[in-house]
């Protein structure tokens, strides 16, 4: 009788637990697409849209994230932090994973993310088919259904996903303009990545790109990574800019968080131009917003500073002669002119856009 009572209690507890709602990720949605390039494989797309997307007419950069079955929540969190702090723009995240019945990510990523076949993984070698899926099926799917900027795509992945990222950089140069590779599996097939880079280098037809890659400091492959980094640095590409880092006291999987944080900062990095006083002084003075907010702009030591009150200020950096920004929050300013004279600016802050007119 006691055993029956215990079973009854456990059953009730399980049923009660099963009634709780699942945690979801606000601002995200799931779409599915079946590929003809990868033999009828169904892919699940985990898509994150920026706040304000529904009422905006602008197009957004798109980050394509590999292995989103593991990393979509992480990247969603990173995006929110980096956007709020003003290091990256509003963007769309498209996480790609596998759909269908009981997909095995370990086997499928070995198939889709590797450029050649290794005997230990007979399913490997499908990277070109997967990239064909992305180029001819996934991009059109996203860009016809979402406000996606086709000229601003970023590829991001770890391990084999990082291998795919570097392989794409060297062999499918027109697909992306930003690449973030966490602990890439550069040793694949006797370091065949060097052969792809050789062909890439000899073509001398490189499109502009920014690349960020890392490795964990406790990984055994650190010497090989450092060799690759030096090799690429010695190439001295004119349009491909590469930044790398060995992450202290970090293992293989642990590279993702810092890599995706710093990688997104790097690929979206804006210039900090030095403007002459003659330019900055055009912008100094008093301004008033449509809601009555009053601010002052001052030139302090060849740096434009905006004051909302004496104790509330932002240092501004010049991305161009008329565009300025701050990095302690999402804060972008674009100055406007009337008959050659500065008459105001548009201020784009986190979830808020406002116009200001110059009053003196």
Regions found by a protein language model. Name each.
Residues 18-61:
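A domain-start/cap signature at the N-terminus of enzymes
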Residues 54, 108-159:
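Gly/Ser-rich "nucleophile elbow"/oxyanion-hole loop immediately N-terminal to the catalytic nucleophile
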Residues 69-132:
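Active-site machinery of serine-nucleophile hydrolases
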Residues 150-197:
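Primarily recognizes the serine-hydrolase "nucleophile elbow" in alpha/beta-hydrolase
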Residues 218-222, 226-277:
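C-terminal catalytic histidine-bearing segment of alpha/beta-hydrolase fold enzymes
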């Amino acid at each position: 009788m006691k055993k029956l009572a215990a079973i009854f209690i456990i059953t009730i507890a399980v049923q009660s637990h099963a009634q709780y709602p699942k945690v979801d990720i606000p601002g995200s949605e799931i779409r599915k697409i079946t590929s003809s390039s990868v033999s009828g494989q169904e892919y699940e797309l985990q898509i994150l849209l920026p706040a304000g997307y529904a009422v905006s007419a602008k197009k957004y950069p798109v980050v394509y994230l590999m292995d989103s079955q593991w990393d979509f929540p992480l990247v969603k969190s990173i995006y929110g932090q980096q956007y709020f702090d003003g290091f990256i723009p509003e963007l769309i995240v498209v996480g790609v994973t596998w759909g269908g019945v009981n997909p095995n990510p370990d086997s499928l990523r070995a198939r889709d993310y590797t450029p050649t076949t290794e005997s230990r993984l007979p399913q490997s070698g499908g990277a070109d088919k997967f990239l064909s899926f992305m180029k001819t099926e996934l991009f059109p799917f996203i860009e016809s259904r979402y406000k996606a900027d086709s000229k601003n795509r970023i590829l991001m992945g770890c391990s084999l996903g990082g291998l795919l990222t570097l392989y794409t950089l060297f062999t499918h140069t027109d697909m992306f303009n930003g690449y973030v590779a966490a602990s890439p599996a550069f040793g694949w097939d006797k370091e065949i990545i060097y052969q792809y880079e050789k062909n890439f280098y000899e073509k001398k037809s490189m499109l502009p790109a920014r690349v960020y890659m890392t490795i964990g400091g406790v990984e055994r492959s650190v010497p090989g990574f450092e060799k690759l980094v030096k090799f690429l640095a010695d190439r001295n590409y004119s349009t491909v800019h590469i930044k790398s880092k060995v992450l202290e006291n970090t293992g293989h999987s642990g590279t993702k968080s810092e890599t995706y944080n710093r990688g997104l900062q790097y690929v979206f990095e804006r210039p900090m131009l030095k403007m002459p006083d003659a330019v900055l002084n055009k912008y100094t003075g008093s301004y008033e917003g449509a809601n009555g907010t009053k601010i002052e702009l001052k030139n302090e030591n060849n740096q434009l500073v905006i004051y909302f009150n004496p104790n509330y200020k932002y240092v501004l950096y010049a991305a161009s002669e008329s565009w300025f920004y701050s990095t302690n929050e999402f804060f972008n300013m674009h100055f406007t002119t009337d008959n050659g004279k500065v008459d105001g600016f548009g201020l784009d802050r986190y979830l808020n856009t406002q116009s200001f007119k110059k009053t003196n």
